Amino acid sequence: MMQGALVLSLAAFIAKILSAVYRVPFQNMVGNTGFYVYQQVYPIYGIGMTFALSGFPVFVSALIAQYRSDYELLPLLKRLFWILSGLGLGVFLILYTQSELIASWMGDALLSSVIQSVSWMFLMMPFLVIARGYFQGTNRMVPTAVSQVMEQVVRVSVILLAASFYGSLTNDLYEVGTWAMSSAVVAAVMATFVLLYYKKSDSFENWNGSRVIEPHKIQWGVLLKRLVIEGGTLCLLSSILVLFQLIDSFTLFKGLVEQGMSQEVAKDLKGIFDRGQPLVQLGMVVGVGFSSSYLPLLSRSYTKQHLEEFEQLKYSLLKMTMVFSVVATVGLLVILPRVNHMLFGDIQGNDVLSIYIISIILASMMMAYHGILQSTGKYSITLIALLIGLIAKGIGNLWFIPQFQTLGASIATILGLFVMLGMIWILSGGKSSSNHQKSTMIKLGIVSIGMAIVVGGLNILFERYFPAGDSRTKDTLLALLLVSVGIIVFIIGAIRIKLFTIREWLMIPKGKSLLRFTRKWKKRGEKDEIR
């Protein structure tokens, strides 16, 4: 089971990287306005993705684990399939037939065809949910993991192919956006084929338990209620950041236009604002990776009531997440203009993005807390915090966008995440910092400030001869150089002030090699002193 959980975590990690990276070439191909078109509708895809991958399949797998030893599950799964089919068909019909209304709520009627394009993926949802839940419920995680990675690879390929047609086959960015969103259903079909391939060697006949459940005893109402409450909660908790983006889709562009801004300028500014999402995703990669790798360890220690080990793992996860999210944020802030130019071709929106990327820290810590609560089955805390955080984000957008435009949306995002993180901390019985935690924060502050001084100092020096925004090639080379310097400074500083324990170093990729290297380095230094 542990190995299976790690396989799923690795697949999720790979999918996160793919999901963050493809947006850069896509934006380069279609520009700010094309990126705006795609990002306006992306949250709908993101919600559908959580339905088919990390929300309902987890619910189905839990249902299988609960009933497998007592009943034949085929009738149960059939009813679940029909309920999910009704849900998927309902969402599809709403999105497809009401696409013009939804587009008008977003403030851009031309988005209608893009919304219709993404709606088709919901018809594939029942197949993916039942198949993934089936395999996960029988502790076979490889089919789900492979289907997830293949789904992302196919989707990214179709999106970039669609973007490549801009300027040759069409000059209509909304048409490109429609093609790009069709990647969702193409990828879902591919994922279904992958799952069917694994299903070939299996049979539902093996699912018979000690007795056969009678169809009338599988109550439709009970299944529907559990699917909505338990499955719906899992879906909401798996789409935290996507829901924040959905609020921006309905309020930011529309809010800018209502303030008297032309639609073309508003689209351009929204496209620049949306650059923050891949930056935040990349900044969160390490933190999310730790959350994924710690989750099975936390679940195992809590289930076996090894509470001391659980507390150690909990503290270690929060510490590692805080360290890497803070370092990533500080590093990005120091060299943001060069990174902006390197990735997106210009240095527009640095002020907006500099606020937005602070969410790397808040979102990473929030996901870490969510992982801890998930391992103990305390979903209600995160759900309450999420709802309050979304309300804060929505009110923040309505309040700040008229005053500060896209900068206001960035501020509202930070506000919403901060409120949510604070609510999670309070509701989970937040305690005052121990001396050990204070020591960690002091050490983290020293390392972060030291890194910022070294990297920032070099950047100021380079700015005299190679101003940011002057040459994309130079900014790319300098950004990569400064990132490398920052990593080296962080590693040396972390080792010198003993920021991590040996066990924590071993949890870091290549951490064991780093420890060996530093030990050899210390021994050589001692020999030189003796001489």
Language-model segments: residues:
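N-terminal membrane topogenesis motif
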Residues: 1-18, 215-241, 504-531
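Specific pore-lining/lateral-gate transmembrane helices of multi-pass inner-membrane transport
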Residues: 65-81, 268-355, 361
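Membrane-interface helix-loop junctions in multi-pass transport and translocation proteins
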Residues: 142, 153-194, 198, 380, ...
